């Protein structure tokens, strides 16, 4: 398991975000960031999590949309009779202390961005300034509080407990970048240096309510809220012949101001009932809501001129608003019958059902502010607000063109499975299962300025066997064998042909993209020299088709 600098999510066995899966208390959980499949693990501090399991061998009862690992996070419950804690911390980055730090307009102290759009094209009604403000002495800070209490209710003194966590974090980063692109024959057509000022603001709230009835029936509710805002100002100066193609060595300046304001709400209800000494029933439902927005992204390009810099013509001056709304419903139920064995009494047969129903709605509005007559600017001190205003729009210095892109994705997954665990003796433990999944995905799109309209569908039936075998060679050594079939579904952004423009890249989905079939084989040797030490050797093979 590894994590790459600058990338939110982890890599497992060389497989990145789309091949891994994250569950929260056993339920699938979406990412707080629409660009990713998995939620960032940075949100889960030791104050929040009880355990984290990384499962690289798969069974019938687990996630099917996985190829690298399933990361299961169990939220913390109250231990003991009561708990209360307050934490405050601070720090600083020397680069942000000594730099006039640039902040974009339109984001408040809590990281909540102003998403107001101007509406009509013949009026310049943008609320946010194009000119970032300068700040100094940027201090990183973190606040957190957690607490809980256990009560005993009823004549049987049944346990009722709650646990709450709330946290706020603000941090600043400054980086100097180099953007360089070449043609296929190695000719450099883009060579720019950049200064990037980034501020990250996040809040997290978690609540757990837990009730035990007569030590046989269990009911729990979990809530989690994650708000994550990343805002940045990037100034890039240098040569770009693909953009600034003129007589001044193709030199120019680009300012990109961007805020990504994302919310994730999680609600989970779970119950477990001991029906008899050998039969138990469990069920649960989870409803997740993701709201991801990129409000008022501002891109301005200035080309080198005789007396300074002028605004580039065409669609090079842009303001952009996008919002993705995702509703994610998960349900599950299972019946477990415990079998008799002469060992650890872990043998059982289980049948179950999992269902996941996801709806994604995406809309992006782009305002191109086409230049007709440009002022001359000096990079040392310039104001774009002095040019882009209602008076200059009325006088014909520039015009506004508005375009809306939309796509929707609907995903339904029905899973039914049966699996068995049996311990033959002190050495051999077998887990054998099979799952049937029905996957239906529909995408409808009207994107790229109306140039691409259409729809696409994916309908698949999957039969997914799994085998896990453990052999205890000695009390300190064990061999494990795992074999399974899983799949990897394309993400919503990957099956819509919407074109996203980044700082140094463009990305576009393909509506004809198909799921991957994954064949997994694992062999592992574990050696425990002492109860607190572990030595492992693992060999694995994966065949990923499509």
Question: What residue spans do the PLM features occupy?
Answer:
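Extracytoplasmic beta-strand/coil segments of soluble accessory domains associated
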Residues: 1-28, 69-74
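Signature of Gram-negative outer-membrane beta-barrel scaffolds
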Residues: 318, 322, 338-339, 344-474, ...
């Amino acid at each position: 398991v590894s994590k790459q600098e600058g990338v939110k999510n982890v890599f497992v066995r060389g497989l990145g975000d789309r091949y891994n899966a994250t569950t929260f208390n056993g339920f699938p959980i979406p990412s707080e960031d629409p660009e990713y499949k998995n939620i960032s693990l940075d949100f889960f501090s030791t104050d929040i999590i009880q355990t984290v399991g990384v499962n690289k061998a798969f069974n019938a009862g687990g996630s099917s949309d996985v190829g690298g690992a399933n990361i299961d996070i169990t939220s913390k419950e109250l231990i003991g009779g009561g708990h209360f804690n307050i934490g405050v911390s601070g720090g600083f980055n020397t680069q942000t202390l000594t730099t006039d730090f640039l902040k974009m307009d339109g984001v408040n102290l809590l990281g909540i961005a102003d998403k107001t759009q101007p509406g009509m094209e013949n009026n310049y009604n943008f609320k946010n300034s194009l000119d970032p403000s300068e700040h100094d002495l940027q201090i990183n800070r973190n606040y957190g509080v957690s607490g809980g209490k256990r009560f005993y209710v009823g004549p049987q003194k049944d346990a009722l407990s709650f646990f709450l966590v709330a946290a706020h974090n603000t941090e600043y980063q400054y980086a100097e970048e180099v953007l360089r692109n070449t043609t296929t024959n190695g000719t450099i057509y883009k060579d720019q240096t950049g200064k990037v000022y980034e501020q990250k603001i996040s809040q997290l709230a978690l609540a757990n309510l837990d009730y035990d009835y007569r030590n046989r029936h269990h009911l729990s509710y979990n809530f989690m809220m994650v708000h994550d805002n990343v805002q940045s100002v990037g100034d890039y100066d240098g040569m770009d012949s693909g953009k600034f193609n003129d007589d001044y060595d193709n030199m120019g300046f680009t300012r990109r101001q961007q805020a990504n304001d994302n919310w994730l709400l999680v609600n989970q209800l779970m119950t477990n009932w001991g029906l008899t000494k050998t039969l138990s029933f469990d069920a649960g439902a989870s409803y997740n809501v993701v709201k991801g927005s990129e409000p008022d992204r501002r891109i301005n390009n200035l080309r080198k001129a005789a007396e300074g810099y002028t605004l580039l013509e065409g669609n090079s001056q842009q303001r952009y608003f996008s919002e993705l709304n995702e509703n994610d419903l998960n349900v599950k139920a299972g019946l477990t019958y415990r079998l008799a064995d002469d060992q650890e009494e872990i043998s059982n047969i289980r049948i179950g059902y999992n269902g996941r129903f996801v709806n994604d709605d995406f809309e992006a509005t782009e305002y191109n502010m086409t230049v007709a007559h440009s002022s001359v600017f000096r990079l040392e001190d310039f104001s774009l607000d002095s040019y882009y205003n209602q008076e200059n729009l009325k006088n014909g210095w520039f015009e506004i063109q508005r375009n809306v892109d939309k796509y929707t994705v609907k995903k339904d997954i029905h899973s039914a499975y049966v699996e068995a665990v049996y311990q033959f003796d002190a050495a051999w433990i077998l887990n054998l299962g099979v799952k049937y999944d029905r996957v239906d995905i529909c995408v409808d799109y009207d994107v790229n300025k109306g140039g691409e309209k259409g729809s696409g569908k994916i309908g698949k039936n999957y039969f997914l066997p799994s085998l896990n075998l453990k052999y205890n060679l000695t009390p300190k050594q064990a061999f494990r064998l795992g074999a399974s079939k899983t799949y990897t579904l394309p993400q919503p952004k990957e099956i819509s042909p919407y074109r996203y423009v980044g700082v140094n890249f463009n990305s576009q989905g393909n509506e004809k993209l198909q799921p991957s079939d994954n064949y997994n084989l694992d062999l592992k040797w574990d050696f425990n020299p002492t109860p607190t030490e572990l030595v492992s050797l693992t060999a694995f093979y994966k065949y990923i088709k499509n």
